[in-house]
């Protein structure tokens, strides 16, 4: 029997440090399953240091709308006048090959996916330690105007109101501690008996053989 993949959805308000945590955690060699980040498509402009095909697939609105019309997205949403979406083929291929997939999406995308998948899926919401710290991080990024930051703070409150829809919560006050908590959750999910009894079926059957 083949082990199917696991889907991990991680959401957080902008400025919480979610992307840094995700890119760091998937490099961990502690996992028992191959763990990969699903690369989302977006119509927004690349930020400094971002790489096409690593952080996002940066595409035009025309191409994104074409993909919507062709029903190519597993989920998609409009955030601050930019589209973000996850391609169906990307998720289906990785799940069918037994990969532990990490999705960096908002609560709207999480709702869409949970309405379609009920097995082998779990969700994590990352919170800032305070409103003041969240605002400070947004200002330190130096990417947005005062008006946009005010809008992002308002959006953050709306996003945080959906925390009860998630299975786990992590507070990103200290990065290393938050990273440890994220690793622990992901590893625990991989070690569930539903997955391990398939992964180690041969070993378990051998251990249960009567001595001759």
From Swiss-Prot:
What sequence ranges are listed for the domain Guanylate kinase-like?
5-187
**Keywords, alphabetical:** ATP-binding, Cytoplasm, Kinase, Nucleotide-binding, Transferase
| Class of enzymatic activity (EC top level) | transferase
Q: Which InterPro entries match?
A: GK/Ca_channel_bsu, Guanylate_kin-like_dom, Guanylate_kinase, Guanylate_kinase_CS, P-loop_NTPase
Residues the record lists as binding ATP:
12-19
Enzyme Commission no: 2.7.4.8
List, alphabetically, the PROSITE patterns matched: GUANYLATE_KINASE_1, GUANYLATE_KINASE_2
| SUPFAM superfamilies from the UniProt entry | P-loop containing nucleoside triphosphate hydrolases (SSF52540)
Catalytic reactions of this protein: GMP + ATP = GDP + ADP
The compartments listed are:
Cytoplasm
Cellular component terms, GO, for this chain's entry? cytosol
* Cleaved signal peptide residues: none
**MF-aspect GO terms:** ATP binding; guanylate kinase activity
Q: Which NCBIfam families match?
A: guanyl_kin (TIGR03263)
Summarize the protein's role: Essential for recycling GMP and indirectly, cGMP.
The record's similarity note reads: Belongs to the guanylate kinase family.
Report what the protein is called: Guanylate kinase
Q: Which organism is it from?
A: Blochmanniella pennsylvanica (strain BPEN)
The encoding gene? gmk
